[in-house]
Amino acid sequence: MKRTYQPSKRKRRNSVGFRARMATKSGRNLLNRRRRHGRHSLIDL
């Protein structure tokens, strides 16, 4: 049986990467929230 999670770096970048976050208002909100918290990494890839 094929498993549900088939990792792909390209797919992951396109959905949760920095550019994807910057493309939407809620994504920008998320980045600003992480900046306010002082996160070492803004995106978790």
Swiss-Prot record:
The keyword Ribonucleoprotein is annotated on this UniProt entry: yes
InterPro entries: Ribosomal_bL34 (IPR000271), Ribosomal_bL34_CS (IPR020939)
Upper taxonomic lineage: Bacteria, Pseudomonadati, Chlamydiota, Chlamydiia, Chlamydiales
Pfam families, sorted: Ribosomal_L34
Protein name: Large ribosomal subunit protein bL34
Keyword Ribonucleoprotein in record: yes
Disulfides per UniProt: none
Species of provenance: Chlamydia trachomatis serovar D (strain ATCC VR-885 / DSM 19411 / UW-3/Cx)
Gene Ontology terms, MF aspect: structural constituent of ribosome
